């Protein structure tokens, strides 16, 4: 059984040293401009090479995060970033956007790709689809239980990676739009402002009263004491979250993970003092998802961290001897030769000290001197001593100099970069769409009861959750797309597969897919792309079109000028693109329930409100094992039909009654102003 890899976060050069010196097997760090932690100290082409040299010399792998969504105007810079990573010889790239995966496959096809947790992979079919697309590893969603992780790991055929320590986002990674819509800072772009750490109160509050409790803030995850179980089921890598944290935090987490992997006790209090939010939770992996998972960073927590810093720094003050080497020293009358090998590389050192005849066997003292590798990454496993005509005495100072010279030479050899082969790839120019002569309207409803009788009039497609399929009259089905659940925890993926099988010959127009797993579930069937795919550029849109999508809904975070550069084709014909024209945007989809802070499920009607510090009320709806938190203000673009160069708009109904939906559809058809509070979303502002 292979040892599970300890993978540490790096957000600065000091964090890199802390991770390596405390014993991490691998590190992950961000490449400037294209990673999900823009606030961290990220690496450019030159500093990345130095980081790879430092790590590879010590037997530590380097994974580079290029795991943001990318806009069209950034694709040329992204291609340069891929070339830089390939030139560094880093061990893998972590990516979210299929445009990144596509460019790696074209430019540096041998460079391994890891599917970021931002890809929202949480099911077996999602992991299998990544394998089909050429990924070597999948970083699984944090929300999974141990049996769910085991099921995926056992059957997916690629490596799996699990978070074992660090911050827990409230929302399923890759599906959070709260920071973008509330402040223009996109989590999918690495700029999350962390609004879930602000007050959001689930208690019923009077209108105008601000929320003061933190019912969207989860404690930090820590399942280090379950590393043996993760290792036993075949998980390849144990990931520590925290590129925005400190070297001391990294050292504490790595040290604890090393102990946990070996079944030794570790100082849980020291780990907690390094950083916690009122303690830790293991609720997801244990399958115990309840109100005890929530917590905040208190002043007492911060004070404990300050007091613990000196002890934590001791964990990474010294170089760790971690690279096993073998030595052979040959002594003859004219001088000495020392050979050092790590099994792959060899280094030599020659001495000219004139050996003197020894009165006793010097083998033991020679071995002692040669074994003194403190301050280097090397650990001597074996020493051979050969003497021609001896025994010979050589001064200890001469032996020490030989050792230093040979180990320095070996270190330099290990620091040699091994770039990945690259292909010359020229990116096609960005397309520039013009406004189509006729733009269509699609209407998405949460349940059949919302659908007005006149909905088919002037609507290209209805979109309904697949669980509502039996409610749709046969005469409506050829214009109805069945929406698959964005998130399918537990048995929901198998249930969804059964529903697809039961409906594929029932006269429906096709399926709206919003997760990478859906591509596999619907292979060979008519598919359209939903916003959960996070399409932000033409390269990704084209990739999805090549995988079978007949239309693509662009992520509502994309600005108008970037929307106009998304124009995929299929068989030489344009593939329609669309935007959400109306709707309360689902800002979060969560497995933990914020309403559990005030009552249990038995006393819940599956609806609720969260009130923020500005007294805004965010609707919450529970269903299919998750909770969806909606923007209190809807997007409305119905009176701006020519503002966005797309083929269709989607009226995305969630909270509305049938009468409200009918009135809104009429307003969109008539290009009328919206009555009430609304937002243009990010279509004109964009995100940073």
Residue spans for each PLM region:
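Active-site pocket-lining/capping segments in soluble small-molecule metabolic enzymes
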Residues: 2-121, 140, 147-237, 244-543, ...
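Extended, well-folded interaction surfaces typified by the phenylalanyl-tRNA synthetase beta subunit core
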Residues: 132-135, 157
């Amino acid at each position: 059984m292979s040892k599970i890899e300890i993978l540490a976060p790096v957000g600065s050069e000091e964090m890199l040293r802390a991770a390596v010196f405390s014993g991490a097997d691998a590190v992950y760090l961000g490449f400037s401009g294209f990673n999900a932690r823009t606030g961290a100290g990220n690496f450019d082409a030159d500093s990345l090479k130095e980081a790879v040299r430092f790590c590879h010399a010590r037997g530590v792998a380097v994974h580079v995060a290029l795991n943001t969504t990318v806009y069209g105007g950034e694709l040329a810079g992204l291609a340069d970033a891929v070339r830089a990573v390939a030139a560094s010889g880093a061990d893998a790239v972590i990516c979210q956007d299929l445009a990144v995966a596509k460019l790696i496959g074209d430019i540096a096809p041998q460079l391994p790709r890891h599917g970021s947790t931002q890809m929202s992979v949480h099911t077996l079919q999602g992991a299998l689809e990544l394998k089909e697309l050429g990924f070597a590893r999948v970083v699984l969603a944090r929300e999974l239980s141990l049996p769910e992780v085991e099921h995926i790991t056992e059957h997916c055929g690629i490596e799996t990676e699990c978070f074992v320590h660090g911050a827990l986002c409230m929302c399923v990674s890759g599906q959070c739009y709260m920071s973008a819509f509330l402040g223009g800072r996109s989590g999918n772009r690495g700029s999350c402002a962390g609004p879930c750490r602000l007050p959001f109160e689930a208690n019923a509050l009077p209108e105008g009263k601000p929320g003061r409790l933190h019912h969207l803030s989860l404690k930090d995850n820590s399942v280090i004491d379950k590393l043996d179980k993760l290792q036993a089921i075949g998980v390849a890598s144990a990931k520590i979250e925290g590129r925005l944290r400190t070297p001391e935090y990294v050292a504490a987490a790595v040290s604890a993970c090393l102990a946990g992997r070996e079944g030794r006790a570790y100082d849980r209090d020291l780990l907690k003092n390094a950083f916690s939010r009122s303690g830790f939770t293991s609720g997801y992996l244990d399958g115990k998802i309840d109100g005890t998972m929530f917590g905040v960073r208190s002043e007492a927590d911060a004070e404990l961290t300050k007091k613990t810093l000196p002890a934590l720094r001791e964990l990474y003050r010294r170089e760790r001897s971690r690279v096993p080497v073998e030595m052979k020293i040959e002594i003859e009358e004219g001088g000495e030769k020392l050979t050092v090998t790590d099994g792959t590389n060899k280094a030599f050192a020659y001495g000219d000290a004139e050996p003197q005849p020894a009165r006793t066997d010097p083998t033991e003292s020679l071995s002692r001197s040669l074994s003194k590798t403190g301050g280097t990454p090397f650990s001597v496993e074996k020493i051979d001593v050969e003497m021609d005509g001896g025994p010979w005495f050589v001064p200890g100072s001469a032996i020490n100099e030989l050792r230093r010279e040979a180990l320095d030479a070996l270190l330099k050899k290990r620091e040699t970069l091994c770039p990945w082969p690259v292909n010359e790839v020229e990116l096609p120019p960005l397309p520039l769409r013009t406004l189509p002569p006729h733009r269509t309207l699609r209407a998405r409803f949460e349940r059949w009861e919302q659908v007005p009788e006149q909905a088919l009039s002037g609507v290209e497609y209805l979109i309904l959750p697949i669980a509502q399929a039996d409610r749709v009259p046969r005469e409506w089905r050829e214009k109805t797309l069945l929406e698959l659940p964005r998130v399918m925890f537990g048995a929901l993926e198998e249930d969804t597969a059964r529903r697809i099988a039961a409906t594929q010959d029932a006269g429906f127009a096709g399926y709206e897919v919003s997760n990478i797993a859906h591509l596999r579930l619907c292979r060979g069937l008519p598919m359209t792309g939903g916003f959960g795919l996070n399409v932000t550029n033409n390269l990704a849109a084209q990739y999805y079109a090549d995988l079978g999508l007949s239309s693509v809904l662009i992520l509502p975070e994309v600005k108008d000028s970037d929307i106009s550069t998304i124009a995929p084709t299929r068989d030489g014909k344009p593939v329609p693109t669309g935007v959400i024209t109306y709707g309360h945007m689902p800002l979060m989809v969560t497995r933990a329930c914020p309403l559990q802070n005030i009552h249990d499920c038995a006393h819940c009607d599956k609806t609720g409100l969260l009130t923020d510090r500005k007294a805004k009320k965010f609707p919450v709806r529970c269903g299919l094992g998750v909770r969806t938190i909606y923007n209190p203000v809807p997007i409305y673009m119905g009176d701006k039909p020519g503002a966005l160069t797309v083929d269709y708009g989607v009226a995305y109904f969630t909270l509305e009654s049938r009468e409200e939906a009918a009135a809104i559809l009429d307003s969109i058809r008539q290009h009328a102003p919206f009555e009430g509070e609304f937002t243009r979303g990010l279509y004109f502002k964009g995100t940073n």
